[in-house]
Amino acid sequence: MSPPPQRIGLPWPELNDGLAYKDAISSSESELTTVSEFYFTKYKSSAPLLGWIQRIQNGQIQIDGEVVKDPNTLLRSGSKLVYSRLPWKEPDTPYSLEVLYEDDDLIALNKPSGLQVLPGGLFQQRTVLTQLQWCFGKNDSYIGSRESPHPVPVHRLGRGTSGILLCAKTKLAKTKLAAYFAEGTSLVGSGNLDQECGTGRKLSKIYRALADGIVEEDEVVIKQPIGVVRYPGVAQGLYVASPEGKPAFSKVFVLERDREKNCSLVKVEIQSGRPHQIRIHLAYMGHPLVGDPLYVAGGQPKCFDPDLVDDAAAFAEDGGYRRPNQAVPGDCGYHLHAHQVELPNLLNTHKVVKIVAPLPPILQTRCET
């Protein structure tokens, strides 16, 4: 009987620690501008003018290290502002992480669906990065033997995506792993088909997914570029299938077809690592992930009119987040799992490290159940 898997993770507190957001006043912003006008103008989607006045009167704003409570305080060029957002309850999120592999340079975690990797949007504390800080940063023996106080993720998985997440424990490991990921993307851009299909590259990534509809071909190669469009609720823009986008390469293998439920269980190997690549590529070929709240056939978002995008609808950068009316990339509901990763041992590149994350039942074939 094999021992139970090692896990890390501490329960989330009811409230997070709040956040501090810093601004520096330029000469153009300082001309007859009050502190309330500055925040309302720059962060309109965070709160109306009255809301900013209340925050100022509540003592949540500092100018050059001093708390100000007068909303009509004039700003000067060069002033340093700090807005302290009060602690709040973040949405419910899993916290336990299974350790799949660990050596002196690398730790591979099995990320559960629903847990965000890095802070952003509604999730500022409830992230994988926070758990790494808590679980390793407080370990005196770890701190004493490492260049970094805790491991750091070297790539991202979507919040709704589960499976293997690689985290570097040293600066050298972070550099090497980042180079492996970058190499895969550069090979796609070079048009080298042999290497795109798996020959000669250092990092291999295989996913398991449940696609809507029946994929009739046993193997499908997708080379649809992925670009960015403006989209409400996504400050940096939304990734979609776009002829003007950057090269992306995915290879899809059908494992099982369920004609009764009208879905296909597929294995997907990706060479590049564009954000949401598998979701976009499967949707582009007419088979979006089952339960995907965002992407539909064609690799585009549901019910989206780019002419109606309003900048004020984006998440506020200061933390006063509003839930958008339309689906955003972090929404869950789909079934996508980073199942296998192969890469060279970082100390001995002649050895290959193969990491496998156990499959969720819904992504197992009949023989695997």
Swiss-Prot record:
Name of the protein described by the UniProt record: RNA pseudouridine synthase 5
Keywords, sorted A to Z: Isomerase, RNA-binding
Family in the record: Belongs to the pseudouridine synthase RluA family.
UniProt-recorded Gene Ontology molecular function terms: pseudouridine synthase activity; RNA binding
Pfam families found in the cross-reference section: PseudoU_synth_2
Domain S4 RNA-binding: 47-104
Residues making up the signal peptide according to the UniProt record: none
Enzyme class, UniProt record, top EC level: isomerase
PANTHER family: MITOCHONDRIAL RNA PSEUDOURIDINE SYNTHASE (PTHR21600), RNA PSEUDOURIDINE SYNTHASE 5 (PTHR21600:SF88)
